[in-house]
């Protein structure tokens, strides 16, 4: 499986860096946003005013050699500084709030939308890609929205304010300084673009190093058995050498950039000193020493907001990719959607109208069904017809790629037929909601998935309000209690991520117990192909028989010896039923099923003899 979407897919830039698309996520917190913007603006005003305090002190106290009024001046100055500290604390807190709130809402929106997407989306996109959209992209967007907003407001207000004050103090001197602003902007833009490309390359190489390191650890046994230690070392060495070269090149650009900015700032100071000093010594246009000093501070301070704003624009260009990928995820439509009429009556995934749900009995019928995947060209099923009465146990047999999983996926409405209809209790499955159907289906995969948490928490997924007595009865019915009793903490034992702390058989039995609690009318089992011990296999067979009683069931059979009691066995090849009947009937025909069964029986006999 490969990632279908990459960084290069987003070459078209959105207006305003895609930020308007985030407005709905900021609206609930507009009070915090406005308050933060106002306080940041006030902080900018204070930063502009602070050099004026210096000017006043030099001109009125130092130059005149008097201390009259100094106490009041110092008191006012301390109050202003204290006010700025308070504003800064509130700003930082509110920026954190916005980052956390927006990040949380972005994650919720993306995760909730993922719950509504069909299987095809997860087949086409890797887990790593989806994880990056939900976690990395949302974190980066939340950060740039909060801190980027604060930095932009402060730097813009400070930049505009400083230029205005400089022109008020001395417009001729201000022109000399402002004339250098475009030069600084162009220099900053040039170096920032280079640094952005290099930083991106550093991140890419770092990902390669991490991947190579993980492969080296997880594949250590393979590396040793193939005797490729030297090749692995060379590959890892080349990647780390690329990292060294790129990092040094990045550092070189950054050092050059800082040096040029410092030179330009020094040049601006020299201009101010030369021109301002001349004005200070000319009687006609006398300029006070304090005024010259504050002007120099403003000229020097002008460089920082320009650099920051250029860097911010560069970051916005980069984060636009994250915004685009996030909004594309939310815009992705499911291949299987309920019609507006169905949603109106039955509700949707998050707001079901259970009071309108009819009971499901379990009659299933395929009417001239043809199916191909959305991005496929060939049909997996063609003109497929099958009628399964309520309570029938159907076993599906066939080679890999014959269409077995496609059949049960259509029953579960994980995919829609390209042509034809699937009827549930005599009605087109599309006439009722997906949630209604899924609530009445129990699906146990080849490798059952257990959620991180305890055994009890996993069992309650089948029925959240189940009593302990119901849970214990369900476990006993499928013999899961024999596995659970062996665990150190019983029902409170941790199953690990994906159930990794349990054996394959243990996960199977717990998933069966979970299905019993859900009490589905249709049961689907993709039989496990992995080998398990004889005792556990016997327990699983008993569990399957219990689950199938009174329910319509579809079993994708891999071990044919386990389906002898099926009411009907379907032998599928290339999307068509080539044989159907009971085990005895098919064995008497000595057709495709007979060949598969005898071949597997002989193979199992050989394996048992060697074991």
Where are these regions (language model features)?
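An intracellular "coupling" helix at the cytosolic face of ABC transporter transmembrane type-1 domains
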Residues: 28-31, 119-120, 136-145, 149, ...
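Hydrophobic alpha-helical transmembrane segments of ABC transporter permease domains
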Residues: 38, 46-50, 87, 135-180, ...
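ABC-type nucleotide-binding domain
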Residues: 346-611
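Alpha-helical transmembrane segments of multi-pass membrane proteins
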Residues: 80-99, 146, 150-157, 178-204, ...
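Membrane-integrated ABC transporters
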Residues: 1-47, 62-73, 90-95, 99, ...
